[in-house]
């Protein structure tokens, strides 16, 4: 495919997937219209970069559907200079978008996770659920996928009043959620059922019902 083909596909993604589905933040729209998503998927899957589903990467991981990324960015309300803790950076697509929005990004990815293809973010390799405490406190926790629960270890790395955007998975259903941390306590609200990739390493502890 030519660069013109990808530009046309990117424009179609914005018009048919984002604008029609409540992604109405013009800064987010502009960033997603500019950053070449095809550069963040394997070469053999570049033609799939703009489909409305997750794109397989490596080691069982996948790139979130465009709509999931757009909604996370919108609900994150990224401001210039925000310190963002990005969990599950994959190949760096969301890191590139967050950087385009003016954020200072610390991107966490597993040791055996995908190779980040964007050099704008500070990359930390290790357990996703451990975060990057050395860069704390953060203004925004951006979990780029769905988890069973947000670990306390991540909440503890956030500034008071910090924003949190994530997907939560329950009984096989993934939901977009957002919230804030006030006095060390995270409050999350469910916004919509939304297809998102499920990140490894975030299993909730088993709870017994009597």
Task: Describe the residue ranges of each PLM region.
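Class I SAM-dependent transferase core
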Residues: 1-101, 108-119, 183-204, 210
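Conserved nucleotide-cofactor-binding alpha/beta core module
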Residues: 77-187
């Amino acid at each position: 495919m030519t660069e013109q083909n990808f530009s046309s596909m990117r424009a179609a993604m914005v018009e048919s997937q984002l604008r029609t589905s409540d992604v109405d933040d013009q800064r987010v729209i502009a960033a997603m219209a500019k950053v070449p998503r095809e550069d963040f998927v394997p070469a053999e899957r570049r033609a799939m970069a703009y489909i409305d589903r997750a794109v397989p990467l490596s080691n069982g991981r996948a790139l979130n559907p465009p709509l999931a990324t757009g909604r996370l960015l919108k609900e994150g309300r990224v401001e210039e200079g925000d310190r963002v803790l990005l969990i599950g950076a994959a190949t760096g697509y969301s890191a590139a978008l967050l950087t385009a929005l003016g954020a200072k990004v610390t991107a966490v990815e597993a040791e055996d996770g995908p190779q980040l293809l964007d050099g704008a973010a500070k990359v930390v390799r290790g357990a996703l659920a451990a975060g990057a405490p050395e860069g704390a406190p953060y203004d925004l926790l951006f979990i780029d996928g769905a988890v069973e629960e947000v670990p306390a270890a991540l909440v503890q790395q956030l500034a008071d009043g910090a924003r949190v955007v994530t997907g939560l998975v329950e009984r096989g259903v993934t939901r977009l959620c957002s919230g804030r941390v006030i006095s060390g306590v995270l409050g999350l609200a469910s916004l919509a059922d939304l297809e998102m990739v499920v990140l490894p390493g975030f299993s909730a502890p088993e709870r017994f019902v009597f």
